[in-house]
Amino acid sequence: MDKLRIMTNNVWSCGSNKPWWIERGLDCSSQARAPKFAPLYKETMPDLIGWQEGDKHFRTLVLPEMKNLGMNYDMIEGGDTSILYNKDSLELLESYFEEYPETIPEYEGKFNNNNTKSFCIGVFKTKESGKLLAFASTHLWWMSGNPIHSHYQPNSNEAREYQINMLLDKLEKIREKYNCPAIAVGDFNAEYDSLAVKATFDRGYRHAHDIAVEYADERDGYHFCFPDGYKPYKNPKPFVEGIDHIVIKGEPDGFVRRFERYTPDYYMPLSDHFPAWIDVEI
């Protein structure tokens, strides 16, 4: 029985320091923040990490720091949605990367800002027992589909639904090819009761939170951390308002043991999204 920890982590793409931070002697630039993710990963030791907003500069800063800490990890280069994996526990068999199109058929508007919305897939074999696993990291369109929201753009909900189905089309082919469980993680920019999440359910996927055997975190895992400042994570919203998701298909019984959001104080100025992970047995 292999035990794996699988994480999704939006690391916040913010390349330069901003006035609010400078005035307080702080630094929110990627140059300052990126190295601080390596100790986080050393502390938690995920076997797989699906990134969002991990741009090229950020990627070049984190992996060397992880190696300095004695961590034997490698990366599937997948744009802002790259995948990191533990080479001590996993062997990479196949990978795939695709950017979502800027436009969506039948819907007016553009739905990919600076080519940051994409998905990356890796197929892995566990080194302990040779079990197979397909893993995908994605970041869906960010603007709101709610007309009263300050960042409203018409058809945004439908765009996210279209994008997640693009990912699942590819992931399903890979899952069937290898006859293995498939896990999709990422920043959906959509809550539990959304078209995007429901689209995964309609295709036979289940949310890790809903099938966790031992523990399921009931917090949303999102807080205020932006160019104009950051705040402590107080009075978290409920799970159903979270936008970072982990969905699974083809898993054996009891596969997901725990679903957790990791919210240490030192992480508050690193990103608006707290890491979420699952502990699985395969």
Residue ranges of each PLM-predicted region?
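Acidic/histidine-rich helix-loop elements
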Residues: 8-33, 100-112, 141-159
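N-terminal, active-site-proximal structural segment of metallo-dependent hydrolase catalytic domains
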Residues: 1-65, 165, 282
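Metal-dependent phosphoester-hydrolase catalytic domains
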Residues: 169-183, 189-282
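His/acidic metal-ligating clusters that form di-metal
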Residues: 118-138, 149-190, 197
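Short, Asp-centered acidic motifs that coordinate Mg2+ and/or phosphate
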Residues: 4, 47-48, 133, 181-183, ...
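Active-site metal-binding loops of divalent metal-dependent hydrolases
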Residues: 10-11, 138-140, 187-188, 274
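Active-site environment of divalent metal-dependent phosphoester hydrolases
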Residues: 13-16, 56-60, 142-146, 189-197, ...
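Structured beta-strand-rich core segments of catalytic domains in phosphoester-bond hydrolases
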Residues: 48-142, 260
